[in-house]
Amino acid sequence: FVSKIKGVFDDERKQLKKLDKIAQEIISLEDKYSALSDEELANQTNVLKEKLNSGSELDDILVDAFAVAREAAWRQIHLKAFKVQLMGGIALHNGDIAEMKTGEGKTLTSIFPVYLNALTGKGVHVITVNDYLAERDARNNGKVLEFLGLTVGLNKRELTPQQKQEAHGCDVTYTTNAELGFDYLRDNMVTSMEDKVLVKGLNYALIDEVDSILIDESRTPLIISGGKKNTAALYLQADRFVKSLKADEDYEVDIESKTVALTAQGITKAEKGFKISNLYDPQHTSLVHHI
């Protein structure tokens, strides 16, 4: 057992060492790209795309792509990525989860794998937990990506189908997990391919607050239905129930991500209050949404 645990840590050290080496290569190109004019730097996107068209893989152009994005971020939003942020970006490109503390530059880190994967032209989705974060990141990181010649879209609930097609048709699309999920469900209900909003399909996604989205948020199913006639009564019942809850004991509020979730104690209270055995049974989805 001890040897297995030791092996896990050894593998992690090897992985970090590999990421460190690649990050150093990226930093070593700083002088090369800082010497370019804005026009020459932006044109590197075309240079990198041509390499992909000539048969190169994304991993082959990673170092140059990250170095280009690093210089562009410095010029456009005055943030210089350090080694730890580059390492995080490489890990995200590899499909791994990168855990970073508050203040370590998670938003800046996301630019690098997003830019690299957008070079394929197949589309990239950046998924966040709420509209505020999606709009903020689209606005701030969008300055860097648009400077480099990429198109950036923001997917919101109030958009028309045509506007959603335009947003999803961009090189990079910022969206919430719920809105992307509903777009996917609606696309599977259309009778004509022309009505689909995910015009590029799903290629590469970068998920912010991945633990919240893939674990916490996944407890609430995304269901499209016609709704029930007793929805008003359910609102009143849910309202009375919520007023009986105690903060921190029955529910927790995450100020940073602007989300609220029932605790285990709160879930038990709900099941007793509404006389059900499992709050997160699909048949109680409407109740969960009302709460």
Locate each region found by the language model.
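Conserved P-loop NTPase motor core
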Residues: 1-291
